[in-house]
Amino acid sequence: MDTVADIAINWLENTNIDGFRHDATKHIPDEFWKTITRRAKAKVNPSRQQNIFQIGESFGSYEFIKSYVNNGMLDSQFNFELFFTLRRIFVEKESDFADLKMALEKSLSIYGYNNLMGNIMDSHDQVRMMAYLDGDLDFSDNGTERA
């Protein structure tokens, strides 16, 4: 754990990157996220005009996603619940903007106005939105993709 954290700190110090996008965060022990965040805040943040930003990617409930945010682990997570709402509206045509309003309000009530969540239209873990919108793929009656 310390070796990987050392490597991450080295990248932050020597490349001037602003942060990290972490994949599959739920498959890595919580202690790692706490370690890397604690060390970045102690060693890298003081020498910069801005804080290091870390966003994670995990699928799960609102409560599960929130468990990673601003508790010493990550600054943000991708908001897949909002992504699925957008897909229901624009691709599946099973929802409307009233549902989008409710999803945004729920997201704000759970994550808070002070957390910058990763609201996305696309993900490498899902079929790309444009594959549906430009007609390359259609959603079948049961919600599976077909060419």
Question: Where on the chain are the PLM-derived regions?
Answer:
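Active-site-proximal helices and loops of the catalytic beta/alpha 8
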Residues: 7-9, 13-120, 134-137, 141-146
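Active-site mouth loops of central-metabolism enzymes
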Residues: 1-3
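Active-site neighborhood of divalent metal-dependent phosphoester/pyrophosphate hydrolases
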Residues: 128
